[in-house]
Structures are given as C-alpha cells and as structure tokens.
Swiss-Prot record:
Keywords: Hydrolase, Lipid A biosynthesis, Lipid biosynthesis, Lipid metabolism, Metal-binding, Zinc. Its cofactor is Zn(2+). This is UDP-3-O-acyl-N-acetylglucosamine deacetylase. Its EC number is 3.5.1.108. GO terms for cellular component: membrane. It comes from the Bacteria. Pathway: Glycolipid biosynthesis; lipid IV(A) biosynthesis; lipid IV(A) from (3R)-3-hydroxytetradecanoyl-[acyl-carrier-protein] and UDP-N-acetyl-alpha-D-glucosamine: step 2/6. It comes from Methylobacillus flagellatus (strain ATCC 51484 / DSM 6875 / VKM B-1610 / KT). Belongs to the LpxC family.
Length: 309
C-alpha cells in the first residue's frame, strides 16, 4: 500500500522572520499516523497546538498565516511547500515566535532539514484528496482552478511589467510524474521590488528581508550579485508558494491546478470553494502502489531500500 510518512528524528534550525526580523527557532518533530501537520507556539502560555486547515488561514496579504485560539503563525508557505514536495503527512512543528524563519527565501533549506532528519514510512495508508470536477475562483482578470487529473500537475502564469521579469519565462507547467520538485522548484526564492520593500519597512514590515533571503529588483534589474538560480525563477517561486498553500488541505492532491496572476489569497479561496462543494472532491487511498498516480509512486527522500519499483 501507499503509506503515510513522517520524520525519523527531530531536527531544529534558527533563522529570522521575514517581516518581524525576530530570531526564530524552528523544531520539526516526528508524529504518529493520522496526526497531520500540526503547529505549536512554545513561546505562548498554555497554547494548544493546532492542525493546518484552510479555514485557519486568516492573513494572505504578504504571506500565508494561520491563527487558532489567539496563536498566530505567519509565512508558512515555504515550509509547507517542502513538506508537500517530500510527501510528509505527519509532523509537529514548534516555533518560539510568530513567524516561520525565512531562511534563504526558498524551500531549499527546509528540504535539507527534512532530509537530514530522515523520512520514514508508517503503517497507515496515505490519504489523498482527489478532484472530481472543475472548481474555479475568479477576481477580475485573475483566476485559479482545479480540474480532474490522475496525477499532480500545475500550470502557473504571472504577468509583471518589469524588464527583468518580462525576459524570463512568465508561465510554467509542471507534471510531477515527470519533474522533480527538489531540482526544479524548491530553490526558487521569493522576490520583491525595492520601492515596495521601502514602503513595507515604513509600516514595520519586511524587517528581516535582505539580499540574502530574497531576489530584490530596482526599476530595471535584479540587484543580487549572484543573479538568478533558474532562468524562470520568478514564476517558479509563485508555483512553490502555490504548492505550499494547497498543502494546507493536509493531504496531497490528485488533480490539476491552474492559476493566472494569483497569490496566497486566491489559492486559499480556491481551497475553501473546493471543500464547500462535496461533489467536487473525495478522499482516495491506494492499497496497491501500482494503482497510484505516477507522481506519487516513487516518493523522494526515502532510503533506497524503500524506494518503489
């Protein structure tokens, strides 16, 4: 059967919050089958831990943030993206501040942490959410959509009127039966424009942002001396964010996701629209690995002895 996955051991890292600028210690712990993805603020007294769910996303202006019973955790999308990319079903995430550390602005450091901790299979069937019919959310010319598809495929288009972005690819399609999350998506960094950074800082935000954890652009060019990691890093980062936003469902998706000029808010609204329509989705498990979509048959991160053939 296709099994659930967790960490072999706990692991910690320290970084800064992108918006708060605060020093943050993040600890990732193994969790029992069917636990799901659970956050806990250890700096708050008597704070109950909470499981990620779309309705707990309360802020999507600059990042994806969860809030439950007064405990808020912001900038979850890169960590959530890494968990999705490595197929982690069950994990406890502890933080001593209100924001996941930004690290280098991508999901790469979180992928490294998860791989260092080790990934193990558990004696429980992995549960998927399968898209049964098209679900769409629109605002003006922006839109996001789920379609039925036996696998996991994403199509994302951005439209930035900036010379440094326009000459890179502004559309990308990835089918995870054929493409590697780690190699092709995970290292794409968040990006921002200098005039926006200055405005955010005047409001007490982006205090932890720097050229070490973001691509920064002025009116004409990329300011980072090392340039881009991918030719199409801008749109790849938007896809990285979307993968993390969608994993707030708590289960991997079997279906196709398409987006045009979308962000955290629209991604979350699409999840809410999906869950509100009971005819649009169903849970799925696979007793035989060969019956599962190719995107999920040979999960990344397992020891070679556990890789499926």
């Amino acid at each position: 059967m296709l099994k659930q996955r967790t960490l072999k051991k706990e692991i910690s890292a320290t970084g800064v919050g992108l918006h708060s600028g605060d020093k943050v210690t993040l600890t990732l712990r193994p969790a029992a089958p069917d636990t799901g993805i659970v956050f806990r603020r250890i700096d708050l007294p008597d704070t109950a831990e909470f499981k990620v769910q779309p309705h707990l996303v309360t802020d999507t202006k600059l990042c994806s943030a969860l809030e439950c019973n007064g405990a808020r955790v912001a900038t979850i999308e890169h960590l959530m993206s890494a968990l999705a990319g490595l197929g982690i079903d069950n994990i406890r995430i502890e933080l001593n501040a209100g924001e996941v550390p930004i690290m280098d602005g991508s999901a790469g450091p979180f992928v490294f942490l998860l791989q260092q901790a080790g990934i193990v299979e558990q004696d429980a069937m992995k549960k998927f959410i399968r898209i049964k019919k098209t679900v769409e959310y629109r605002e003006g010319d922006k839109w996001v959509r789920f379609d039925p598809y036996f696998g996991f495929k994403l199509d994302f288009t951005i439209d930035f009127n900036h010379p440094a972005v326009e000459h890179t690819g502004q559309r990308i399609t990835i089918d995870f039966a054929d493409n590697s999350y780690i190699k092709e998506i995970s290292r794409a960094r968040t990006f921002g424009f200098m005039h926006e950074v200055e405005a955010l800082r005047s409001m007490g935000l982006a205090r932890g942002g720097s050229l070490d954890n973001a691509i920064v652009l002025d009116e004409f060019r990329v300011l980072n001396s090392d340039g881009l990691r991918y030719d199409d890093e801008f749109v790849k980062h938007k896809m990285l964010d979307a993968i993390g936003d969608l994993y707030v469902l708590g289960h991997p998706l079997i279906g196709a996701f398409s987006a045009y000029k979308a962000g955290h808010y629209m991604n979350n609204q699409l999840l809410r629209a999906l869950l509100a329509d009971g005819d649009a989705w169903e849970y799925a498990t696979f007793a035989k690995i060969e019956e599962a979509p190719g995107a999920f048959r040979n999960p990344i991160g397992l020891p070679p002895a556990l890789q499926y053939v």
